[in-house]
Swiss-Prot record:
Keywords: ATP-binding, GTP-binding, Nucleotide-binding
Protein name in the entry: Nucleotide-binding protein LVIS_0651
Function: Displays ATPase and GTPase activities.
Chain positions recorded as ATP binding sites: G12, M13, S14, G15, A16, G17, K18, T19
Source organism of the structure: Levilactobacillus brevis (strain ATCC 367 / BCRC 12310 / CIP 105137 / JCM 1170 / LMG 11437 / NCIMB 947 / NCTC 947) (Lactobacillus brevis)
């Protein structure tokens, strides 16, 4: 149903932060398209409704396509004022001085500038977009916003319980197979007693209850678990506040079969009460694969 599709059209002044905005919407799970020709939007909207496969869409439409200016203004006005396509218009703005400064820093030319005069292009663009700015559902002034602060502002306005951007990737692994290169935090649990040396547990993994119980019933395991969980509870909010969209925590033992798997499972349950958590066990099948090859 159309009511179930959330469409955000990102527009505004050139240099005001539309690229950062689009990247932020991508992290919120939106399907994003940059600089779509306005003539294609009605057809695209029909395809979206017919397919039913997309529920969150963000489009950047601005005056870079100068040849389509009349279409752009008419389309944005229809969306903002008349509510066509069940869309919301997000308008990004900044002061003339800040926009000039940003253009000087990047050494790019303004799309509406004549003879390279940036301020002239900004003035013309501001005049042309004035009706859209007035009718937009949300205007964000980025003059004093860093990219991270703009990202936070967009999250504040568009993040919902079902589209939470921040999530935790929790991974077990075996040191003998190498460190996970994408991990933000790596914890070595090879100091814990190893179930591998118990014949009845050797061919099981931390996913099996006997191994899980053996690992968790060790006195040092409980003390370590509580301390490590306390550390994560303290530092994870800081990672989120700094603008990370995901945090990868890797827990390693020798082969990635027993200790790391059991602890990753338990931590996943605990952290999952507060954050979206995805648990993977990178090397849990490695021994089975080796046995099959030999």
């Amino acid at each position: 149903m159309t009511e179930d599709i959330r469409l955000v059209i990102i527009t505004g002044m050139s240099g005001a932060g539309k690229t950062v905005a689009m990247q932020s919407f991508e992290d919120l799970g939106y399907f994003c398209i940059d600089n779509m020709p306005p003539s294609l939007l009605p057809k695209f909207w029909d395809l979206v409704r017919e397919s039913g496969k997309l529920s969150k869409i963000a489009l950047v439409i601005d005056l870079r396509s100068r040849a389509f200016y009349d279409e752009i203004v008419r389309m944005l006005n229809d969306v903002a004022v008349h509510g066509t396509m069940n869309a919301q218009v997000l308008f990004l703005d900044a002061s003339d001085a800040e926009l000039v400064s940003r253009y000087k820093e990047t050494r790019r030319s303004h799309p509406l500038a004549r003879n390279g005069r940036v301020l002239e292009g900004i003035s013309r663009e501001r005049e042309l977009l004035a009706p859209i700015r007035q009718a937009a559902q949300l205007v964000i002034d980025t003059t004093k916003l860093s990219p991270r602060k703009l990202r936070e502002e967009i999250f504040h306005n568009y993040e919902t319980e079902t589209t939470q951007a921040f999530h935790i990737e929790l991974m077990s692994f075996g040191f003998k197979y190498g460190l996970p290169i994408d991990a933000d935090i790596v914890m070595d649990v090879r100091f814990l007693p190893n179930p591998y040396y118990l014949p009845e547990l050797r061919n099981q993994t931390g996913m099996d209850q006997p191994v899980y119980d053996y690992v968790m019933n060790q006195p040092q395991t409980e003390e370590f678990y509580q301390r490590f969980l306390g550390l994560l509870t303290t530092i994870v909010p800081g990672y989120k506040q700094e603008g990370k969209s995901s945090l990868t925590i890797a827990i390693g033992c020798t082969g990635g079969q027993h200790r790391s798997v059991a602890l990753t499972q338990r931590l996943g349950q605990a952290l999952g009460n507060t954050y979206p958590v995805h648990v993977t066990h990178r090397d849990i099948e490695k021994r089975k694969e080796s046995a099959n090859r030999s």
